[in-house]
Each structure stands twice: as structure tokens, then as C-alpha cells.
């Protein structure tokens, strides 16, 4: 019986590991296409594919559901509940960049700019190509009237996603 559980554990672990690896492979391909893209329409399509991968936890479907619930609460301006949900997700998986990103967004909307920047820094340690976090970082710096830092964040985002309409408007 122990052998059965051991084999089952190996199969499950291998599947979860493969799923995370597949997500990274897909992201790498999409980021290459995004950098080479020369139309805003195609850029938006690629961005949406990247966001779908970021928003989907690679191994835990419940965390994906929780992230969506937290995002719904943000849309309804229930920031404290959303913050708590994102914090619980982070407690369960501190390596999921998108949970940190959503919490950073929530902190920004709550007016807690320094805390938002701390979370954004973690997002960027986990996923250095997170153009959304870089744009968010720029927005936080704009609110703090640190315009040079804001510009640099927007510029860095434009290197990753050159055709993003948000950064194209902000960078001359």
C-alpha cells in the first residue's frame, strides 16, 4: 500500500511541476513575440494571453478562484476584503507574482503607496517582465510626485512591451 501512495505522489508532483514548466515556456514565447510585435492590436492580443497565464495559478486551481474573487472585490471597491484575500493567497504561495501584484494594486487604491511599492518590488523579483507591475510602479511614483522614477518605470515597461498604448502615451 505504501508503494501505491509513493507512486501516486510521484505522478502528482511530476504533473504539477510539468504544468509550471509549461506555463514558463509559454510565457517565454509570448514575451519574445511581444517584444518583436509592431502593432498595437497584436500587442493587445499577446498581453491578454500573458495576463491569462499570470492570473492562473500553475498548480492550485483554488488559488486562481481566490484571485478572481479578490479582483471582483477590488472592482466593487471593497479593498480591505480584497487585501485580506490576496494576503491569504500570498501566505499559501509566496512565489505567485500575480497575487503580489493584485495586492499591490489594492494597496495603491487604498492610498498606501509605500506598501504598494514594496509589493511591486516582490512582483518584479518573481517576474522581472511584469509590465503591469512596472506601469503600476510608475503610477505610484506619479502619485508620490517622484516623476523621474515614474518615467523610468514606464520606460522599463516599454522595453518589455514596446507597443503598449499606456506606455506609448506616457513616454515621448
Regions found by a protein language model. Give the residues of each.
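TPR/TPR-like (Sel1-like) alpha-helical repeat modules
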Residues: 31-38, 142-166, 172
